[in-house]
Amino acid sequence: KDGVAMVFHDYDLKRLTGSHGAVAQKTSTELRATKLLGSSEGIPTLWDVLHTVNGAVPLLIEIKDQDGAMGENVGALEVAVAEDLIDYTGDVALMSFNPHSVFALSRLCPTIPRGLVTDPYKHSDWPTVPKETCAVLSKIPDYERTSSSFISHSVDDLKSRHVARLKSQGALILCWTVTSMEIEAEARKFADNITFEGYLAELPTYVANR
């Protein structure tokens, strides 16, 4: 609400905090005072996280679509994120489902790697996104326009011809969301990296060998 970038997964507070209300309708002070379920910690700002990590590990930051329709109403959050990253020296990359957001990031912080979060976009899975927009986004047409270097695609759709096209052109392929070692093993036959939850994935080689 006050132009500060917050680190939080959902649009609504209920699932992760037990509180009511939309994140976008709260000030950063209110959100930092809102305790996460099972924790004494409040919702952190992006600056809080950057200060804590301080380059110790790479960060992949997803910028959430703000209007629920993948529309062109972007700018404020992207500016806030770019400002927080001005003096950050650690490894970081940015991504979003909304190609307008990724395009804005290409202008605001052109030296930071960026990518598109992608999906087959069945309209039944995206009821707030217009059918026409779903049809367009399913083809991943904005990769070049946004000067992306990777996509993060639905793990259930990695055999998509659109994903194969980008991989053949040199794009790095990430995927979401992997929920078991069995799914991970299958995904890694094609994907360069994964987003996982609900189990402990093996440490990447570069971490294990430190």
Which residues does each predicted region cover?
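Metal-dependent phosphodiesterase/phospholipase catalytic core, i.e.
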Residues: 4, 9-121, 144-149, 153-155
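C-terminal active-site rim and adjoining tail of enzyme catalytic domains
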Residues: 117, 124-210
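A glycine-centered beta-loop-beta connector
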Residues: 1-5, 187
